[in-house]
Amino acid sequence: MQENLLEKQFLNHPLYAKIQELKALNLACNFSLDDSVNLSTNSQAKDEILAIAKELKPWRKGPFKIDDLFIDTEWQSFIKFNILKPFMNEISQKCVADIGCNNGYYMFKMLEFNPAKLIGFDPSIKYRLQFELINALAKTPIKYELLGVEDLPSYGLKFDVIFCLGVIYHRSDPIKMLKDLKAGLNKNGVVFLDTMYIEDEREIALVPNKTYSKIPNIYFVPSISALKNWCERAGFKEFEVLATKKTDENEQRKTEWIDSFSLENFLDPKDKNLTIEGYEAPKRVYIRIKI
């Protein structure tokens, strides 16, 4: 029911109609990848593209370049992608899901590694519209579902590789989320996951009071040992830490494409190692887990 409601709202959104008009032009487009997702059309639709893109703010993940329009997103998402890039050979000719895919930036980048099928899950109409704008020009076979991680067990298709980046700390039941990821895997499947974490050798998690780094819907920020225990309780047998990285103001910052505050406003102005609330400043751990 929720899926049908979101899909109906999406199809009735005025920007969806504008994107369909753009798509109907069937513009010739050169699609290329570097740090940005690059689209070169040399078209007469530049004004329309700019107007739609501005209406779709905030743009969180990216960047994207459409002709001479540079969508300078809040996150320099290629930094995270480059951390995972050495492991991208695992998606070649595989059925791949990106859970919490936002506007699809990571999926566009994954195309370079030739997945057999690529499906994004995110129950956000705005992010889906951002994806549709880019894909109206790029014309890729990526599929986007207005669904969440809880829909994986009943989705009807199992995946060889699942990416779940920056999601688990938004869930009030992280072990249930991990079980849902496990239920979405084929035999011998693998999950790549990242989360914010705290430095502590104990098997504990930070439970923020109201906000963490000014973000209201953060439930648990685990130690790496606690994260490992969550994964084991969910039924994963293999747990490997791939990398850790502190989030800095090069990776996440305010731009004209978000119209709101960003990391510099979320940290203690006197001590950048602390959030404005006094917690450890955000840092991320990247893991690979298998059944």
UniProtKB/Swiss-Prot annotation:
The keyword tRNA processing applies. InterPro entries: CmoB (IPR010017), Mo5U34_MeTrfas-like (IPR027555), SAM-dependent_MTases_sf (IPR029063). PANTHER family: TRANS-ACONITATE 2-METHYLTRANSFERASE, TRANS-ACONITATE 2-METHYLTRANSFERASE-RELATED. This is tRNA U34 carboxymethyltransferase. The keyword Lipid biosynthesis does not apply. Homotetramer. NCBIfam families: PRK15068.1, tRNA 5-methoxyuridine(34)/uridine 5-oxyacetic acid(34) synthase CmoB. It comes from Campylobacter jejuni (strain RM1221). Catalyzes carboxymethyl transfer from carboxy-S-adenosyl-L-methionine (Cx-SAM) to 5-hydroxyuridine (ho5U) to form 5-carboxymethoxyuridine (cmo5U) at position 34 in tRNAs. Its EC number is 2.5.1.-. It catalyses: carboxy-S-adenosyl-L-methionine + 5-hydroxyuridine(34) in tRNA = 5-carboxymethoxyuridine(34) in tRNA + S-adenosyl-L-homocysteine + H(+). GO terms for molecular function: transferase activity, transferring alkyl or aryl (other than methyl) groups. Gene3D superfamilies: Vaccinia Virus protein VP39.
